[in-house]
Each structure stands twice: as C-alpha cells, then as structure tokens.
Amino acid sequence: METLVGGLLTGEDSLISMSNDVSCLYVYDGPMRVFSQNALMPTLQSVKRSDQFSKGKTKRFIIDLFGMKRMWDIGNKQLEDENLDETVGVADLGLVKYLINNKYDEAEKTSLRKSMEEAFEKSMNEEFVVLNKGKSANDIISDTNAMCKFCVKNWIVATGFRGRTMSDLIEHHFRCMQGKQEVKGYIWKHKYNERLKRKQLSKEEVKFDREEYTSRSFRLLSFLKNSERTKLEPRAVFTAGVPWRAFIFVLEQTMLVVNKLDPNSVIWMGSDAKINTTNSRIKEIGMKNQGQTLVTLTGDNSKYNESMCPEVMMVFLRELGIKGPMLEVLDYALWQFSQKSVKPVAPIKKRTGKSTVVIKADSVKECRDAFNEKELELIQGVEWMDDGFVRVRRGMLMGMANNAFTTASTIASSFSFTPEAVYTLQSSDDFVTGSCGRDVQHARQRLEMALKVSKAAGLNVSQKKSFYVEGTTFEFNSMFVRDGKVMANGGNFENMTVPGGLGPSTDLFVVGKQARNSMLRGNLSFSQAMEMCKIGITNVEKVYYGNRKYQELKNEIREKCGEETMSIPESMGGDRKPRPWELPQSFDGIALKEAVNRGHWKAAKYIKSCCSIEFDEEGDQSWDTSKTALVVIRKNETDMRRRTVKTRNPKDKIFNDAMNKAKRMYETVVDRNPLLGLKGKGGRLTVKDLKARKLIDEVEVVKKKKHV
C-alpha cells in the first residue's frame, strides 16, 4: 500500500519533491511474505545489476598482494561527465581523495590511524572460534551450506590447521593458496547402486591443488531473504566460506572503530540510540543556523549493495597512511569482492506437463526450454563458469561489509561549501540529510549539491523512494520523526503479535512489552496499543488453548480448585482471561493479588507455585554435578522425540528400556507440574534440579549408562 507523504507527515504545502509534486512511502500494514521459490532468478538479478552499473567504466590492473600478482577490475569515472539521473556503480577516485583530505586534517588522521591499528591487532589476535557464530556458511570443500561451526570444522580437518587466532588462520590460508599445504576432504555424492537398483549417498575423498583451493575460497552461495516488509519480490542473500569470513571479520572490526569516531555514522548504535541521536543532531543543525530554513531529506539509496566500490576504501586506507601487513590484509579483504562467484544453494524445480524437472546450477544453460523469455534474458546476461557458478566482479552483494562501506558513504554524503550547512547521518543504505539556507530554495540547492557529490562514492539516492520536507520531519530506521518528536511505528501488527512458541505467558508478555515501548517512544495512542494486545491475546488462544494436553490440564485444575479457577489465568490452565491493559505489566502477579483479595487460597497457592520467582533462591544445579537421567522439558509435550531402535542385540534392548523409563519419568513430572511444558518456565532440568526446586517429592530415577 502507498500513502502520500504530504498527507501523512506534514501536509502537501510544505512538501518539496525532487522529481514529482508528491512522493510516496510504504506503510507496513500487511503480513510479511514468505517466499518458497528458488534463489536462482533473484541471484541473477543482483549479479546483472552489479555488472550493469559499472559496465564500460572499469579498467583491469595487476596488483601485488602478499607477493602474488593479482588482477583487479578497478572502476573510475569523471563525475562532471556523468548523467546524475543514472545509477552508476563506480566512484570518482580523484574526488574521493579530495573529500577525505577535506574531512580529516593531519592530526585527525594520526589519531584515527592509531585507533585502527589497535583494533586491527585486537581482531587479529581473536580466537578463530568467533567464526562459529551464525546460522549458515559455505562449506568450500563440498560447495554446500551448513552451520558455521560445522564449516569451520570441515575446513580445519581438510587443511590441517593447528593454530588458534585469526592471524594464524590467515597465514595458514596463504600457505594453502601457495601450494605448501595439502588440502583434502570428503564429499557426499549420489551414485547408482547396482545391487539395490537405486541411487545411494556415498562418501568420496577429494584432493585440491593450489588453483582449485584458491577458486573455492571466493565462492558464495545464495538463498532467499524471507519475511521482508513491503517486498513483493524475493531478494537473494549470500554466505561465504571460512577464509572469506576471516578477512571480512578483521576488516569490519577495524572499520567499526572508524564508525564510532565518525559523527556522521550511526550504524554501530542500537535502534533506540540510533533514532534519538539522529533526531538530536538534526535539531542541532537548525540551532547552529538560527534564522535559516531547515530542509530534511530522507529515503533510500538505489541498489546500495550492487553499487558499492571497494576501491574507495583502498584510497581511504592510503590517505590515512596505513602501511605494512595491516594494509595488505585489509587490501586483500577488499580485493575478494572482485573475485567472487555465486550460485544458489538448492537446485531449481520446473514443472513440465505432468512431471517435475530438477535443474542443477551447472545445467541451467542446457535446459533453456524450461525457462520463459524474462528468465532466459537473465541467464544469458551473466558470465557463467564451468562448474555452474556465476562470476561477479563488481558490487558488495547483500550485507557483507556494512561497516566498511558505511565509512565510504559518509566521506561524500555531507559535502557543503559552507561549513555545517549540510549534515548527513548514515547507517548502511539508510540515511537522513539536513540542509540549511536563507530560504527553502537556497537549502534545496545546497542539498542537491551534496547529492551530486555523493555520487563520487557510488551513492545513488532514489528519486522515487526519497523525499524532503521543511523542518525536522524524517523517517529513519523504520521510525518516523515529526517536528522533532518520534512517531511510534509498530511496523507490522501481524508480525509483532504472532506467538513465538515460548509459552502463553511469555508470548503475551512480549506483545505487551512491544505495545508499551511503542507508547513510550512516541505518540502511539492507548487505544492502538490495546488493539495490539487484543490481537496478541487472540493469537495465543488459537495456538495454545486448543491443545489436548491443555484441556486435560484445565480439567485437573477444575477438580482441585472448583470455582476458584476464575482467579487462575488462562495461561496456567484457569478461566481468567487476561485484560489487554494487563499485558504490559505482570498480569500473573495481578491475578495472584486478586486471588488473595477474594480469599481464593487454592488458586493463589497454585499461581505462586507456577511462578519462577520463588525458585530463584534455590539456584540452578550444574549439569556436571548431576549424574541422573535428563528430564528434557519441551514446548510441545506431545512430541517426546524419544527414539527407539530395532532390537538386534542385548544392548539395543537395554537402550529401549532406558528410553521408555525416561519417557515415563518425563510424563510423570509434566502431569504433576504442567507448567514445566512451557519453554521458559522449566527450562532444561535434571531430576536433581526438580527436587531442589521442590517441584517433585519422589520420582523414579534412571541412572545414566555409557551405552545410553
């Protein structure tokens, strides 16, 4: 849905548009879409844009990196010869050099260089286990994606790495690239089994030479980015291998210090601090230029990821005086962006008549009949490699070095011939620019000059998605500021009120907390917050209260407490429905107080026994000290996940008996204390923990055995 900015924020009279009389802005009033298609076409779109924006404006150079001769397609342009309405993915390096020297004097360069050197040393001495963090990464041994910790493990096994720090990892990586270290690993392939008459997964050992290993270290895998607001078409995100991520980690940690010292960057701040800092600094511009008119520009940069230029950061490092191994490591991290190749994680499926055809990435060019004209145009418009990967020589691709490229953006985004007349705050591709002048037209001229100069660093402000208004009214980080006051933007009501599976009490409290924060941040009305709470209550009822176990729990409580169940909250199995205005508070505590005031002592005792406050005094028992069988408390009590094996020997029978005893133990505990079935209430407990918390008196204990 599109809403006129003039009517939404300040009125059409005060609106100044760059290209039209009225611009537009998306309002988050619909559910987030979850895409189930293949990532091939979104990947090719991103690759084609990266090549298209820099076509004809790059020149190939031979550079020296760690004693190795490498090729780099470096882009450069003359800004005065460019059409400013076009999106261009190269920078004016001569103008960038001037802007860097204009922004930092020699004393500031010296101070910044020392801070960067300290951050670089600290990041190089970090243990490599920091690369384990993350959901998914590229396993360069088999070109498949897996959890980050498994990718790191596979790389260590294949290359024989024995170091501890990031510096050791980078040094070992270069030994592998120079052929001084053997690289071998295992891959799984589907092979036809003659005896079984079907395909079967088989494990194969593979060895890589120097060229193959180097090529694989630059490979990226793509998949779809889901749950995006206002996005009708999916976008591709990319994941890299261990060596790539190691260099980017060092680069990002080093440039994080630059962003913290840069007054124009707010990427390192949290959501609340970011919007409050931006609001206060835009106000300062108006105060420093009293008597002048303030115009605020906000919006979006067109194709930010595909337009970013690594060579801008190379100029930045040299102008600061960075030298030696630090310069080589950071240069290599930036050079990687010119050598990357990508392919989707999963093969693409196409239906032809009554059958479904599975097309792998390396067979796309041979299966042209399965694609339409628009898809064929994308397939033919990119550079394919023999192994099904697509070469991408330009651009950043989504979210790989945000700290570094935010620094590149702030170099050129606040240019003005008059000091402190134009001020920009940048957070990746999101920005706010304030401009002051004698009148609206003068402020607009200064703003347009800043936009033209920002083209030098590869920034392309979108004329369709951007707008500027008079005064301190802008949008930043999905929050609106009107006349200096933050307007609460709940974003997507449906997404914010969906239960997270943490249990009814916790999910209700999360909804109430979000509604309360929206009221505190800005001018979200009380009735709107209550509407959000009502939606959350309805969704929790649909998810939890139709469960068979919940109904059994409710019947047991009615037998024990009788009419006093009207004082027990629904989230604990009672009949008391939560009121919307209770969600931002402790509604369980409110129910306990009401039960005491009414004299419903059975209900009060039950509510108190379900609360986790009184158990904090006991403390959690260590897993190491307890040798009893584990009682795993799960969100869904009906799904035990206790597997049994086919009985083939005496050990299997003992194993099955132990699993059955553990299952009975679990059911006994949950039947006596149903609230343990809610994640966050019971957690992950042993029998000893349950006894210490006085949840159970006696329960059958199954001792751990080695074969279990």
From Swiss-Prot:
Pfam families: Flu_PB1. Its EC number is 2.7.7.48. GO terms for biological process: viral RNA genome replication. It is an enzyme of class 2 (transferase). It catalyses: RNA(n) + a ribonucleoside 5'-triphosphate = RNA(n+1) + diphosphate. One of its GO terms (molecular function) is RNA binding. The RNA polymerase is composed of three subunits: PB1, PB2 and PA. RNA-dependent RNA polymerase which is responsible for replication and transcription of virus segments. Binds the promoter sequence of the encapsidated viral RNA. Displays an endonuclease activity involved in cap-stealing. Cleaves cellular pre-mRNA to generate primers for viral transcription. This is RNA-directed RNA polymerase catalytic subunit. It comes from Infectious salmon anemia virus (isolate Atlantic salmon/Norway/810/9/99) (ISAV). The lineage of its organism: Viruses, Riboviria, Orthornavirae, Negarnaviricota, Polyploviricotina.
